[in-house]
Each structure stands twice: as C-alpha cells, then as structure tokens.
Amino acid sequence: QKIAKGQWKPIRDVNEIDPKDGYDVISTIDVYVQDIAHHALLESLQKNNAEHGCVVVMETKTGQIRAISNLGKDPKSGNYYETINYAVSESHEPGSTFKLVDLIALLDDNKVDTSKVYDSRGGVVTYRGKRVVDSHKGGYGKISLGQGFEKSSNTIMVQAVYENYNSNPQQFVDRINNMGLNKPLGLPFKGEGKPKIPQPSDASWSAISLPWMAFGYGVSVTPLQTLTLYNAIANNGEMVKPLFVSEIKEWNKTIKKYNKQVINPKICSISTVNKVKALLENVVKRGTGEKLYSKDFSMAGKTGTAQAN
C-alpha cells in the first residue's frame, strides 16, 4: 500500500493493529444549564470589569456537575476567554463564605446558640493590634449570632469564634478538617488546587491566626471545595464528591457507570443542618443577599467579599 511521500508499507504486516472505535465519555454537563451559567458569568464579569471568575452548578443529591464555566480577561483585548479552570485549580482565601464553617462548628460543639447576642462594638474589634472591621460602617450594635451571620458581620463572627475556641484552637481546626476542607477533593484530573488550613502546631501560627480564620482569611480553598461544603448542607449533612462523568459507553453499551461518591456521610448533626439552612435562607430573604430574593423560587446562600489588604 502506497502511503505518504511515495513510501510503501506491507498490507499484511503482523505488527499492524486494526483501528478500533474509542469509547464514548458521557459527561454530567447539561448543555442548557451550561449555556445559561456561561452567559450569566460573562455578563457579570463585564459589568464589574473583573479579572476572572467562575460558576459551577452541582446537583445536590448526586454531586453531578451540571455546569461549569471559567472566564479570564485578556489584558490586551479586554475580552473574556476560558483558559484556566479557576473552579478546580485556584486555591484562594474564601472570605465571608467561610463563616458557614464558624456556624457549623459553634452549633455542633454546643458552644452557643444562634440567639446569643454580641456587641459589634462600632464595627471594629482589635486583636494584638490588628483590626477586624465590618463592611457596614459603625457596625450593627447588639445583635444575635444568627443576625450577625445573615448580615455577614466580621466582628460578630470573629468574637464568637475567638471567645469559644481561643483556649483550644485545635478543636476549631479539627472541625474544619472533619469537613474535609484540609485536603483536595481528589478529582480525576490534573491541576486541582491544594487547600491551606493553618494548624496550631505550625510555626507560623500566631495570636491572630484564629480570629483571621473566622472571617475567611489565612485559609485557602478552591471554589469547588466551597461549593461541595455548601452542597453538603443542602444535602442534609452528606458531603458528596463532584462528578464530571456519568458513564462510559461503547456502541450504546454501558462499559462503566459512575455513581454518587460520599466523602463524609455526616459533616454535622441534623439539628445543626436545620439551623444553618434557616439562616442561609434568611441571608437571601433579609440579609446581604436580599437583592437575589424572589417569591417564585426557594433559595439559600451566602455572600462573600474578598479584600485586597
């Protein structure tokens, strides 16, 4: 048989392997949800002139990823392109979204209840000369822990964590580790970002490590880890691993099926789950996420804002 560049090859070569059709990989992505998520992200990035961003939609019970979009801005053209998988690879300080960890720990360790009142102290509390400041100038006066979470008060959440864990910070860190935030999710592809959870035994641990962790600084997790944690609350405490592939087929015959993978069957008690769910709903109804509220949908969530300094 004559091949490229006028060369010949034997047609009965015993070493020749006949071509074979490859397998079909069936992803979990819903193209309609993906399209909506992608364009919503693009619109938000353009509106805020953001450098980059990501959005991920996870099915609560199964962990199947129904949409994932990552967009970064080209500094030359100003256009947005998908070049880096930020949702998977970017380990960063989560800011106020980490306050969910505070709440779970405080409630599950029976330290306080959501009705306990704290003083926001004019919106500023100080630890070893370092200030923790509320985004709302002047603070919120005296409010309950639950209200502090709904309003995303740094001073309230930090005081609650510091007051109850300063004598034994390892107990707080153990709670974080129990939620699986101290290790990667173990996704089946390269490039997953590594989380960073300070340990009291670390040489870098200081007097401000605990209060800074309480409002999401000094710690690093990926967006997908944050989503997996919040999904666990929606899933009544069961944490499931994100799935990107549902099955592998050959000629419409299923070769392998990927089922739900449980990371932690119970990250906290059902009592804590129910209290946290109610507060996450209130964040949208009357808290920092109220702009998203609609009577037409059941929603819960938590806002998070990072600061540069």
List the model feature ranges, each with a label.
Residues 2-16, 20, 29, 53-91, ...:
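Beta-lactam-recognizing serine transpeptidase/beta-lactamase-like catalytic domain environment
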Residues 23-33:
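Conserved beta-strand/loop elements of the cytosolic catalytic core of P-type E1-E2 ATPases, chiefly
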Residues 41, 45-46, 180:
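Short regulatory alpha-helical segment in sensory/regulatory domains of signaling proteins that mediates
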Residues 44-51, 208:
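Flexible, solvent-exposed loop/hinge segments and secondary-structure transition points
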